[in-house]
Amino acid sequence: FARGGSNKYLVEMMEEGLVEYILDGQTFDLEGVRSMRENANHVWTSPFTSYNYHSKGNFAGLVDVVVLGATEVDVNFNANVVTHSDGYLLHGIGGWQNCLFAKTTILPIPLFRDRIPVVVDEVTTLCGPGELIDVIVTERGIAINPKRTDLIEKTKNSDLPIYSIEELKEEAESICGKPQKISFSDEVVAAINWVDGTVIDVVRKVKE
């Protein structure tokens, strides 16, 4: 099965027999809407069950591969999805953390945004621990978490542009320069909870 948000590409995969079911939480285009209307195997699901760590319907950890976004990744493969590199809040985390329990987690990210490196020494806000993030894909190369020796072995003799995460960070800094550190006040404006409710980081107010 594939977990949606669905779009025409996911629908085509199901209709061509590449996946048997789409378990959908939202549709991103009219092809997804059409498929949900016409295909019995295109099933509506609620994120309150499918992504809920405490729910019997939670299937996020059953997924073989998940592809997610991130605003920052650091050299320890920790990821940020809730603030930008300027320290300001972007949006909520949603089911992003729950998806990290998939067998392989891939984060496709640009190496930099608006001349600001995305691969950094330390993320501004910790949302996902590096031990759950397996592959970083950028337009200038791919980094595989050293803990995933199986993936490193399988890609050893491939033509893929594989680098260490440190090499990607250095590439970003050679183009953009090393970013200045943000000045924060002591005021806490948000808490970052892990899926079990544990607070793993906080967001502090940016000094004007």
Give names to the regions the model predicted.
Residues 11-12, 18-208:
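Conserved phosphate- and dinucleotide-binding cores of soluble alpha/beta proteins
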Residues 1-5, 24-26:
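Active-site nucleophile and cofactor-binding loops and adjacent substrate-binding regions
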Residues 7-9:
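Glycine-rich loop(s) and the adjacent beta-strand/alpha-helix scaffold that form part
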